[in-house]
């Protein structure tokens, strides 16, 4: 008899609601299938320091290996007093034992708090104070970061993973040897399985409350537009897609790079993994996609074995799509648009992007007003509303009509649906500012993204509501301007932002980080480049009040693809440049 879908058990609670059942099912169907492959520390060090190295040796865990680790570790957790309803803070990089540790918590009904490995000590402290975890799973580096953070020091159960010099409550390696095997507990559909935090680019990071039902719905939504074959070997740089692979029964190759600390040789490492392991599918951010493009084009290399690459986390330009087509001629490129709270929202293939009519076709110096991110995911409800800074309440259809913008006009995108996160963990204020519960009891997520919906059903993103520039009574958006700036031959990174101005309200500032920072001291060269930038921007009808050449531009730590406008603005003010 076919098993019911995970996350849709009838009744208030049920074992089949527990997302661990995804892993259980694949263990029962194909226990000997490779589940995860990774490069161990010794092999990576040999590769990094051996100039003649051309291959990376990968170790393998089967679905049976992972399943057995999970059930025995979960039994070990229970002996430590960890139980259903507790919160567990997980601060571990992308290694196989991360997923074993997380699934072991989830099968017990423990609320698992996952933080990116680049999180700072103050962010760890904030999360611990918000969620009040009973247990902390981390390497010794994480525990050392907890010094001076009362909420972290107060966590009663600390489990160390990896080498350690101090004695903690328990060692993860010892829990793997627990003789007993735990059974999954029954949970309600809306029982919290995972809490993941936004980057905080628009303020304090918010903890998205991902229930067992939500994780199941998200898996089915991703699987609908990114279906995998049993033979696929997938390399995802996003932890959430590794979790999705475990739910899909796909073999995952973990990236042998530190996504939190980008290195110059990352594209070479990825190329080596892709070719050496015969990887067929890839999920990565635009920054890594761009780096892989440039590496292959400069070295004259191609990736004929790839059948699909999915890119997400930030906008992907037509230029990057065109470059990718040259290095991976047999691969379909899928550009995903989503967020911590709703993934996926839209998607578009590279071929669809290139088939769209563009103003660049008539003049290569012209740039479209926004980035086309494609059509909405199946089952997603959406609205575009006028720009409103602050909470919104909707109690009638009339109020919705007053908020919504006409078809094709720019507005803030709102989404609702099964795979849209409905609340934030222990944070009613975040719900108030980022959600709208309307008179029909539908919870709408305010994405904070500004865009428009064209007659062909495509969504065009033009910027973020927090980064919109109000200049002389008109709204200006960064996306188009930054594409123009990035096309300049001298540009490494670029930003277009507003700063307070007594006459205009806000003035526009173009910030360019050149490929060679030594150029910044060459006043004549900078003047020539500024003249050219102003000319091209004027041609695109984009006002420019100031041009600054700056050594660097701060980017978001998660994707290395989004400008941290607030930090950049503060840097420019502190330096007296604006």
Residue ranges of each PLM-predicted region?
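AMP-binding/adenylate-forming catalytic core of the ANL superfamily
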Residues: 119, 136, 272-275, 282, ...
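Conserved AMP-binding/adenylate-forming core of the ANL superfamily
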Residues: 14-15, 35-95, 99-103, 120-125, ...
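Conserved pre-ATP/AMP-binding loop-to-beta segment of ANL
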Residues: 34, 166, 170, 176-197, ...
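Conserved AMP-binding A3 loop
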Residues: 60-64, 193-220, 251
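Conserved AMP-binding/adenylation subdomain of ANL enzymes
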Residues: 216-233, 238-281, 295
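ANL superfamily adenylate-forming
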Residues: 44-55, 135, 141-189
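Conserved AMP-binding/adenylate-forming
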Residues: 322-336, 340-451, 455-458, 465-468
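Conserved C-terminal "lid"/linker of ANL adenylate-forming enzymes
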Residues: 495-500, 509-511, 531-578
């Amino acid at each position: 008899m076919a098993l019911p879908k995970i996350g849709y058990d009838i009744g208030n609670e049920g074992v089949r609601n527990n997302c661990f059942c995804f892993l259980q099912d694949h263990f029962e169907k194909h226990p000997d299938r490779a589940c995860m492959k990774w490069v161990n520390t010794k092999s990576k060090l040999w590769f990094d320091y051996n100039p003649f190295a051309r291959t990376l040796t990968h170790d393998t865990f089967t679905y049976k290996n992972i399943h057995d680790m999970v059930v025995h570790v979960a039994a070990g957790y229970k002996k430590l007093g960890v139980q259903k309803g507790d919160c567990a803070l997980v601060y571990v990089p992308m290694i196989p034992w991360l997923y074993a540790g997380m699934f072991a918590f989830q099968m017990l009904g423990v609320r698992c708090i996952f933080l990116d490995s680049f999180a700072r000590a103050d962010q760890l402290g904030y999360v611990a104070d918000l969620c009040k975890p009973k247990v902390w799973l981390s390497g010794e580096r994480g525990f050392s970061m907890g010094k001076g953070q009362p909420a972290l020091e107060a966590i009663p159960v600390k489990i160390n993973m990896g080498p350690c010099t101090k004695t903690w409550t328990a060692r993860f390696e010892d829990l793997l040897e627990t003789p007993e095997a735990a059974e999954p507990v029954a949970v309600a559909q809306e029982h919290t399985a995972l809490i993941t935090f936004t980057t905080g680019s628009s303020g304090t990071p918010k903890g998205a409350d991902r229930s067992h039902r939500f994780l199941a719905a998200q898996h089915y939504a991703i699987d609908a537009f990114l279906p995998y074959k049993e033979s696929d070997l997938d390399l995802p740089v996003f932890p959430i897609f590794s979790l999705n692979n475990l739910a899909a029964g796909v073999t995952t190759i973990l990236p042998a790079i530190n996504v939190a600390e980008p290195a110059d040789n990352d594209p070479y490492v990825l190329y080596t993994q892709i070719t050496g392991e015969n990887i067929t599918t890839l999920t990565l951010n635009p920054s890594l996609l761009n780096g892989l493009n440039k590496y292959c084009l400069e070295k004259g290399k191609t990736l004929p074995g790839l059948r699909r690459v999915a890119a997400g986390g930030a906008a992907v330009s037509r230029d990057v799509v065109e470059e990718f087509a040259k290095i991976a001629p047999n691969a379909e490129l899928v550009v995903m648009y989503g967020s911590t709270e709703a993934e996926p929202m839209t998607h578009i293939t590279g071929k669809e992007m290139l088939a769209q009519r563009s103003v660049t076709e008539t003049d290569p110096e012209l740039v479209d007003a926004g980035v086309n991110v494609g059509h909405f995911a199946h089952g997603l409800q959406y609205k575009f509303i006028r720009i409103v800074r602050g909470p919104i309440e909707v109690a009638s259809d009339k109020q919705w009509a007053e908020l919504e913008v006409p078809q094709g006009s720019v507005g803030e995108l709102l989404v609702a649906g099964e795979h849209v996160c409905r609340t934030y963990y222990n944070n009613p204020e975040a719900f108030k500012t980022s959600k709208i519960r309307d008179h029909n009891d539908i919870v709408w997520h305010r994405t904070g993204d500004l865009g428009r919906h064209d007659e062909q059903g495509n969504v065009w993103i033009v910027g973020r509501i927090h980064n919109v520039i109000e200049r002389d009574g008109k709204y200006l958006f960064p996306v188009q301007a930054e594409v123009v700036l990035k096309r300049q031959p001298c540009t490494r990174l670029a930003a277009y932002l507003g700063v307070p101005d007594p006459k205009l309200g806000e003035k526009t500032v173009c910030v360019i980080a050149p490929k060679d920072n030594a150029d910044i001291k060459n006043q004549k060269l900078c003047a020539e480049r500024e003249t050219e930038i102003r000319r091209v921007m004027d041609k695109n009808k984009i006002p420019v009040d100031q041009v600054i050449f700056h050594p660097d531009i701060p980017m978001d730590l998660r994707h290395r693809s989004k400008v941290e406008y607030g930090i950049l603005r503060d840097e420019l003010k502190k330096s007296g440049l604006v």
